[in-house]
Amino acid sequence: MGQKVNPKGIRLGIVKDWDSKWYANSQDYSKYLLSDIKVRDYLFDKLTNASVSRIQIERLANNAKITIHTARPGIIIGKKGADIEQLKSIVSKMMGIPVHINIEEIKKPELDARLVAENIAQQLEKRVMYRRAVKRVLGNTTRLGAKGIKVMVNGRLNGAEIARSEWYREGRVPLHTFRADVDYSSYGANTQYGVIGIKVWIFKGEILNHKKGTLDEVARRGATNQIAQKIK
């Protein structure tokens, strides 16, 4: 099962956190969800050169907080903060509420699955041999402390007539272990032979101390509520 599903989705509430944090009734849920999708698409497109890995959206009572995880914060902030103020006004109009934008710098982009996949895609678009690009990434990631990394490339590799998939792995990537901190991302490289799909899994170690609100605690609270209802 762990081999098939999205490694991030199956670990939500255990070792991974949600990208959107808000509560809504049934009438507003779809509106908020569509708004989040539009904002994320706009920011990823606008900040293509800023190495953005993740965008978290948190809705409060009458405003919203957006946290942008990036390896190049200077590009987003701009000179004297002019660019981020302009970005804030545009996003506020899109969401219809005041927005506060927070920038979080990624210290080690080589350990971020999205940035690694994006790096491979950029090299493939510059006509670098895919084996050289992947092996360079494998070496950099393991050298900076990753326990394991797995990369899959799929498409017309090196301009071959028939598309194929190739896998590369360094270390171990335990997809069945829920406490394992596995980062995952997919990306597409637009080459002259077509789109080459790239998938990256990075294992950073096991998280033994679960945070408050894990699935175990949720299940425990649910069982307690059922017992209380039976007693009543």
Swiss-Prot record:
GO terms for cellular component: cytosolic small ribosomal subunit. GO terms for biological process: translation. Coiled coil: none annotated. The keyword Magnesium does not apply. SMART domains: KH. InterPro entries: KH_dom, KH_dom-like_a/b, KH_dom_type_2, KH_sf_prok-type, Ribosomal_S3_C_sf, Ribosomal_uS3_bac-typ, Ribosomal_uS3_C, Ribosomal_uS3_CS. GO terms for molecular function: mRNA binding; rRNA binding; structural constituent of ribosome. CDD domains: KH-II_30S_S3. HAMAP family: Ribosomal_uS3_B. Part of the 30S ribosomal subunit. Forms a tight complex with proteins S10 and S14. This is Small ribosomal subunit protein uS3. It comes from Ruthia magnifica subsp. Calyptogena magnifica.
